[in-house]
Amino acid sequence: MAYKKSKKNVHKNVETVVAHVRSTFNNTLVSIATTDGDVLMRTSAGALGYTGTRKGTPYAATQVANKLAKEMLGLGVRVVEVNLQGPGSGRDSVVRALQSSGLGISVLRDVTPIPHNGCRAPKKRRV
């Protein structure tokens, strides 16, 4: 039985997309999806070649956003809705990089999950 070859899903003329930014203390991950939820592209600081503690820096998050912004402008995207999640240091850097690249930000949401006294938090660091 022959397998059907799947073609890469090419979305042209997408005006508005949603950028899901997950910023942890160790890395920054950004996924670009349509408003329906179909993921168009994604990358992270680790995928760009940063290793160790450099992945969690604001500079690495800026580079991630710049790479995706260049690809989005190539697809014809003009407006971005941004969903921020997590406590990392790359949150503000991603938003600033998307604005400076020429993309308009229509909605800026913080979707960080907040527990109502759920699991026990990790112990505090003693340095």
Label each region the model flagged.
Residues M1-V127:
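Ribosome-associated RNA-binding proteins
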